[in-house]
Amino acid sequence: MSHATGAAGASGPIETRLPTGVKDFLPVKAAKLEYLQATLRQVFARWGFRPVIPASLEDLSVLELGLGSDLREKTFRFDDRQSGRLVAFPPDITPQVARIAATRLHDLPLPYRLCYSGRVLRHAEQRLGKEREFWQAGVELIGLESPEADAEMIAMTVEGLLAVGAREFTIDIGQVAFLRGILEGLPLPAAAARELRAAIATKDGTSLQRLLDDHPVPDRQREEVLALPRLFGGIEALDRAATVVDNDVSKRALDNLHRVLQVL
């Protein structure tokens, strides 16, 4: 049996505490985690998804192309001594898979069915005691835009959750185009637009009202924005949304969601 010993001349015990927000996984929990990952990989494979393992580091400028403002602020970044560029530990694997699909898979036919799993790091408010290291597993279906494709992803998600033992869960279904249609053309400076998106993400109606009061937003667009925090729930939420939005982009997004639910 080997024993670790301290360096000659050491004056005290070595500090072995981990940084805040990260953890080791000892054998029992590590085995559970391995089981969950293996089970999900089997589900992904049955649906035709192939694994990719993205790089541990990314150029910050490339990574930020696929990150929202919230994740940009949570990204661990530092100077690369070799290149002199800013690099980062990805806080989300999704933008990395998008980069791989856009730059490395030209010799493969569309659609791409790609799956992944791994650790990601994110800055967190220390006073809140939040984790900074997460396990993320997921899939990306690229190059096939249809209600049937969306329904396929939802059905596979349900199968994956059941396979790992989940029995009570809720799946939130949304459409980025619906929000884009509401926000397009809003007469807001860049800083106010970012603040508005953050308030929408947290369903902060008070902040939305304040931002709209501070800028000359037309009444119809104001009504659409202020309705956003209330537009959640079952299929009835789509009916409520249809009475609120008055732009073609959002209307088409609602129509697509209706068709997805019909396929399911």
Predicted segments, located by residue:
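Short acidic, glycine/serine/threonine-rich loops at helix termini
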Residues: 63-65, 126-132, 181-186
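Generic N-terminal amphipathic, Lys/Arg-enriched alpha-helix
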Residues: 16-26, 241-243
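Charged, compositionally biased N-terminal leader segments and the immediate start
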Residues: 1-17, 188, 195
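Short, conserved phosphate-binding/catalytic loop or strand-edge motifs used
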Residues: 131-137, 173-181
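Residue-level "edge-of-site" marker
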Residues: 57, 174, 196
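Polyanion/phosphate-binding surface patch
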Residues: 21, 55-87
